[in-house]
Amino acid sequence: MKLNMRFTVGVFFILAVAVSSCDTFKDEITPEKYSEAVKNIDANWQLSAVSRNGIDITDMMDFKRFHIVLNEDNTYELKNYLPFIVKGNGSWSVDDPIYPFHISFKEDGMENEVKTLIGFRTVDGKRQMTITVSPGCPSNKYVYTFKQVTE
C-alpha cells in the first residue's frame, strides 16, 4: 500500500510539473511590431580593392582615386572614372530597400539601365559595399570593393 501511495504521489508530481511547464512564452516584441531597418547606401564610396576573376589586382593601379557618390535623391556621380558599368552620372535604385541584392544605374540621357549584384558587410566597424561587374568582356568578372567615406 505504501508503494502504491508513493507511485501515485510521484505520478501526480510529474503530471503537475509537465502541465505547469506548458505555459506559452510571451515575447514583449511581437513580429507585427518589429520591422527591419532600411539600408541607407547613399554615401560617398571610395574604391578600396579590385579583383578580376578572383585575383586581387588592387596594387596594379591607383584604384583608390575612384569614387561613386550615391546621393539621397537617388542620383549618382562618378569621380576619377575607371572602367565601370556606366560611364557618366545619372540615377540609381536598389531592388529592395531593406534587403538590397541588386543596384541599377541609369546614365543621364540613356534609355536603358544597368543592373548588377551588390553586397554589404562590416569590416573593423566600417561599412563596405561590393559591386560585381563585367565591363567589356563578359568572361572577365570584376569585384569592386568600396569603403564608405565619411567627410
Give each language-model segment a name:
Residues 1-9:
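Bacterial N-terminal signal peptides that target proteins for export
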Residues 10-14:
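Hydrophobic helical h-region of N-terminal Sec-dependent signal peptides
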Residues 17-21:
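C-terminal motif of bacterial Sec signal peptides marking the signal peptidase cleavage site
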Residues 23-87, 97-151:
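Lipid interaction determinants
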Residues 90-94:
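Short beta-strand-centered aromatic/proline hotspots
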